[in-house]
Amino acid sequence: MIITRNSTTPDALRETMSTTQSMFRVAAIQMASGPYVQANLQEAGRLIELAAATGARIIALPEYFAIMGMKDTDKVAAREKDGDGPIQNFLSGEARRHRVWIVGGSVPLESSQPGKVRNSCLVYNQEGKRVARYDKIHLFGFDMGQERYSEERTIEPGNSVCTVDSPYGKLGISICYDLRFPELYRAMGDVDLILVPSAFTETTGKAHWDTLIRARAIENLAYVIAPAQGGYHVNGRETHGHTMIVDPWGVVLDRLPRGSGVVVAGVNPTYQAKIRASLPALTHKTVRQW
């Protein structure tokens, strides 16, 4: 497996961050996206503006924020070339307009297979420059009762772990079903914030969402920002919601059970450093396969 580490922060700034970084706000957006890209982008823009108004420096959108189609192949029809398209232009423009870092949930990008897409989380800095791309590695498959999902039919999996340096610490990027594979997060190394844009079903979400999010925060001693789809969708799907931000001790700082909205919380690097010093579990790893 390839590990991609995106470094956009100058060495001098990283040294300054290690000694002087103070608290900052982050925001996670919850949506109930529909089949029309332009309408979804309009709603995402409204919510980004609300999040930016709180002073959030990192704003994260949920998986499939731009399209939750009537059928799985709708996202293939809406796919974009890497680096060009209305969804990518929207993300870059919003980051630049509000002077914030934006984690763009997931965007359907062209893949090597014509009938499939890459489900890609794109990260933009405050200048609107894309600084990271993560292609979802683990593809959701579920068959229980009347519910059947098989992402592999329309998505080509990625094969690279993704981290990116930011003025706010090192970010580890993942998407939804990745949550069930803790080895992915170990492969990231020591990250300060974990991003998990998601669209958990109501069935799996009510059973496992809270546990998985808090577990990833606790075992990595990291903040977890988990924007989600939450509610009933035009295509008949019901998503769990419960967008949340969790601290390195596993405490849920804020959450939104259902519907469109914004979750905001403060990130305290000093608090995180103290927790890691008190419980240095990351230095106690003895299995070195990662």
List PLM regions with ranges.
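Cys-nucleophile CN-hydrolase/nitrilase-fold catalytic domain and related Cys-dependent amidase chemistry
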Residues: I2, V37, G45-E127, E202-A222
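N-terminal active-site segment of His-dependent metallophosphoesterases
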Residues: P10-I58, L195
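Residue-level recognition of beta-strand->loop/alpha-helix junctions
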Residues: Q30-A32, P62, D135, A228
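Short beta->alpha transition motifs characteristic of CBS
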Residues: I67, T73-D74, L122, R133-F140, ...
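Active-site catalytic loop in hydrolytic enzyme cores
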Residues: E80-G83, S112-G189, E202-T211, R276-A281
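CN hydrolase (nitrilase-like) catalytic-core segments centered on the catalytic cysteine
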Residues: D82-V103, K170, C176-V263
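Short beta-strand scaffold segments in enzyme catalytic cores
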Residues: G104-S106, S120-V123, C162-V164, T243-I245, ...
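A conserved C-terminal secondary-structure "cap"
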Residues: Q272-W290
